[in-house]
């Protein structure tokens, strides 16, 4: 298996309280990888700790954490009750928010409007042609080609797929009944690709294709993406403001929540938190206390204003203040040999 590894070198000016610099490992979601690449490099410079992260998909990251071979998992899908029952107690730490965009490759089409129902019908294979009357009705000023639609989706266990299909189950009874939500879904037709980079690459190279990716990947490859109608009837593009609007409601204490298709003015409907997930008891697999301390130092660094301000620069959105407060409260429950690490 080929892993997408983001690894940075140790820097000077460490502010780690005098402990020995550590090597941390994580694996999981590719959705936040552009943000994490920046964060891990900066963290090495200010704290002296090295972070190696394998972008293998949320499902793979959760499996690695379950098998206790990483310090943290990255996931765009919070763990289900069943998944948590199969593991020791964990803490979910939202690190930023982002958007799943519906990107497309159509000659001459710079703007496209879609509804959730139409997106569901496309990925279910019920809308097969770009000039379908339902697409034409949403885009009366756009000349859509008489060409077959090529859906592109993830081949690996993916939090991005979970967010996308979670949204579709909320807007399409057909999708909920036939496909449901999950990290892996049996799409009826189209082309599969691994990771957000893989899906974005296929879309960029395939005329008449459409697929779902993290917004940063579409932006990096200059792939256009659709305005999507939200609950309020607004056709919205993702931005820091429209993603933040989706998180304006109440967040539960354990931070496990979906913010797709929320009823809020200006909200982008396929928005999500992305999480780092760690074990509540950090003494496992011969990990040292210093390694546990470095893991929490990384998470505290990500929650800092300095790092949260970076999110918008790489097409994500910062965490709401309340979510940051919940994170710090939850991190104070993390222990090493039963003793809280943060005092």
Over which residues does each language-model region extend?
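Sec-dependent N-terminal signal peptides
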Residues: 1-2
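C-terminal motif of bacterial Sec signal peptides marking the signal peptidase cleavage site
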Residues: 5-9
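Flexible loop/hinge segments at secondary-structure junctions
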Residues: 10-343
């Amino acid at each position: 298996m080929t892993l997408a590894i983001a690894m940075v070198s140790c820097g000077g000016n460490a502010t780690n309280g005098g402990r020995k610099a550590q090597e941390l490992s994580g694996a999981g979601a590719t959705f936040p990888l552009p943000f994490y690449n920046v964060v891990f490099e900066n963290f090495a410079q200010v704290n002296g700790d090295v972070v190696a992260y394998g972008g293998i998909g949320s499902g793979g990251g959760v499996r690695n954490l379950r098998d206790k071979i990483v310090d943290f998992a990255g996931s765009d899908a919070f763990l289900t009750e069943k998944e948590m029952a199969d593991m020791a107690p964990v803490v979910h730490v939202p690190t930023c928010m982002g958007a799943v965009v519906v990107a497309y490759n159509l000659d001459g089409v710079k703007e496209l409007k879609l509804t959730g129902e139409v997106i569901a019908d496309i990925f279910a294979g019920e809308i097969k042609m770009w000039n379908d009357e339902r697409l034409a009705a949403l885009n009366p000023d756009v000349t859509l080609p008489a060409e077959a639609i090529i859906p592109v989706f993830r081949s690996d266990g993916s939090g991005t797929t979970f967010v996308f299909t979670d949204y579709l189950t909320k807007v399409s009874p057909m999708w909920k009944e036939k496909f449901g939500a999950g990290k892996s879904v049996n799409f009826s037709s189209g082309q599969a690709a691994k990771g957000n980079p893989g899906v974005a690459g296929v879309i960029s190279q395939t005329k008449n294709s459409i697929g779902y990716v993290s917004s940063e990947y579409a932006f990096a490859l200059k792939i256009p993406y659709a305005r999507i109608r939200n609950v309020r009837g607004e056709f919205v593009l993702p931005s820091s403001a429209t993603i933040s609007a989706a998180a304006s409601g109440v967040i539960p204490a354990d931070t496990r929540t979906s913010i797709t298709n929320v009823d809020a003015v200006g909200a982008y409907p396929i928005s999500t938190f992305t999480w780092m997930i760690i074990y509540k008891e950090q003494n496992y697999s011969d990990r040292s206390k210093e390694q546990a301390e470095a893991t929490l130092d990384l998470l505290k660094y990500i929650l800092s204003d300095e790092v949260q301000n970076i999110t918008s620069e790489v097409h994500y959105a910062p965490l709401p203040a309340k979510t940051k407060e919940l994170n710090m409260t939850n991190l104070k429950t993390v222990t090493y040999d039963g003793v809280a690490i943060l005092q």
